[in-house]
Amino acid sequence: MSRPRLTRWHASSAPRSASSEVRILAPLQPKGPAAPIAANAGGQLIYAIGDIHGCYDQLRTLLKRIADDAGADAAERKPSLIFCGDYVDRGPASAQVVEALCWIKRHGPFATYFLKGNHEQVMLDYIADPGPVRSWMRFGGADTLRSYGIAPPDADDPIEAHVMARDDLLERMPVAHLRFLEQLELMIGAGDYAFVHAGVRPGVALADQSPEDLLWIREGFIDEDRKYERIIVHGHSWVNERPTVLPHRIGVDTGVYQTGVLTAARIEDDGVTFLSAR
């Protein structure tokens, strides 16, 4: 069975259209109208997984549900998993999550694609030079260090304390974890969909989006009601435990580290449904 055709975005890839509608699996209901989305997935079955944030138990449960769901699909096609970034920070088990994703990448039965989130970028920045990003400790970095068995310094501690913590992290973190983080993608395209972590800058072609916007954007994207070259599937911004479903974008981050709910969008030519795990 050949690998599904998911690619990095190229501006020359013209989107196609087909009639489909959004369907929501109970008990979740979408934020916003469940308006019809004229889109296809290129004949593929895709699961787009929202921000995990160190919540290993929910990840394990969701992957089991995805495996069961994919196994019930009669079509002769290899499903694809697209992880939408923010694997680390805030939850208690970032190291376990990264280890699980490394295993899935090497041995899993699905085609797998991993997007970079802003939290992975800050973690990599801390590894490169902790001084400018000591504030990482305030928005989840301390939880990630603890998951690797490291006592985190306070954000305001002297730079020497952060250099020591960084060095301890490099000693304890498996090389495979670092390589995994370094190889994350910024955007993946499939059919009429583009998958990113945070969103895109309105008025800028997908091929010309900046890494900063793909990783960090909120204002100017989530409050903008406009069509893009493709339907944007993203994480990063959440309201509650319900996914966001709009004609121009689908938000799969459901704030698992606070709500306890991890969500995946199931995307195929017939439409979009959702799986969730607590």
Language-model segment annotations:
Residues 2-278:
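Feature recognizes metal-dependent phosphohydrolase scaffolds
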